[in-house]
């Protein structure tokens, strides 16, 4: 058909022309149709040929009107067969193939648009369309083959989409999704792995920080709060150290919510006695700052007088009204004793350097007697005798000693040891305080060796339970003797057998292996049931410890080696 130069470049066109020159110009017969005709000739007989001739004549008479349609269909089928021959396929390839060399491809290949050829099926038409579209998606020859993997291709496409969104200054969610063209593909493959800087225009709501909520300053509210705090009394502002808000002037005070008890004459007497003790206490401190023992004695007398006056004033009140003043008076006495104890500790710190502790004990007792008589006279009032004062002071002193805290009394006795007063001294200093409740130490338990139970007795009870279990009925205590005899007889037979076995084998000592061999001959020990299994199953704990070494605490193994 065409001249072919053997020295020229082996292009697809030249190769196809050689194939066409050497191929048979006739359309080859299909082997399937040939096989079908041969089978049909073998199966035909005389009767079948006669019937087929009749059917053919009938079919010809009926199909005369449709011969034109059949002829056109036959022509189309014939053309259809001609299109499927290798010659027609190669002609179509020659029409669409470019004139280029296989060994030296050109840099840019632009396919020539071929005329549309009617394809016989959809599959072949799709193949032809793919052949036409493949040269458009050819990547550059400088790319590595490993970068064309499908998984990595998706990643590069994502990078290209991100780069395109950054270049356009649009958020990634608004970018249209679709297949990228060849230019975006090559640009994504040529990207470096450095992370690009994110511009201000790209909004990432997941990573953006929440703006701080700043409230505008309300000048009116600030001035109102300032006015409320300025109108509040200073003592409430200083005393209120709780973590909640300060009480304003218009708000109800916390202290008014507490129940207030009506004032009685007994409470007035308490307040008066408290004022007298407070006024007399600082005077004593100013007069004799270097005499702590004298100060303590006078203080005790004042508290005694206060308690005596309180009892005398509250004697005419009813039972319920009498309990509350007593409780309040005891609480006030405790508070005063604590405050005076703090002042005493300060006095000790200031006056410990001077030699004031070497005073005579007689002077101390005289001062305490004088001050005690003055305090009792003020609290009792005119018309009371000295004997009544002594009796009332003796009655009130135990209550006062019990009301004062024990830790404060111990600290005072430890700091200021009072000298021994003469027999005519004050009653409070001579009477001892109530003894404190001292807990007895727990008795130390003797940690001796625990008494071990006799394994023989424990074994007998175990065997009794075992016998009753296998007998499936309870057993009386009288049967225990018979069980014990059976056990003795069994162990006696076992020992005799061991002795005979040892004498026959020439052994001087019997080992566990010998016993296991004997019990294996008797049928008690088998491959499935070993000697240890029998011991664990049938012997009590005491015997098991003797036969099988058991580890105990203290790194000691029983039995000891």
Swiss-Prot record:
SS bond list: none
Subunit note: Component of the CENPA-CAD complex, composed of CENPI, CENPK, CENPL, CENPO, CENPP, CENPQ, CENPR and CENPS. The CENPA-CAD complex is probably recruited on centromeres by the CENPA-NAC complex, at least composed of CENPA, CENPC, CENPH, CENPM, CENPN, CENPT and CENPU. Identified in a centromeric complex containing histones H2A, H2B, H3 and H4, and at least CENPA, CENPB, CENPC, CENPT, CENPN, HJURP, SUPT16H, SSRP1 and RSF1. Interacts (via N-terminus) with the NDC80 complex.
Record PTM Phosphoserine, positions in chain: 47, 343, 345, 356, 373, 385-386, 397
GO function term, MF aspect, one: DNA binding
Organism taxonomic ancestry: Eukaryota, Metazoa, Chordata, Craniata, Vertebrata
SUPFAM superfamilies for the chain: Histone-fold
Protein name: Centromere protein T
Name of the gene this protein is made from: CENPT
CDD domains, per the entry: HFD_CENP-T (cd22920)
Organism: Macaca fascicularis
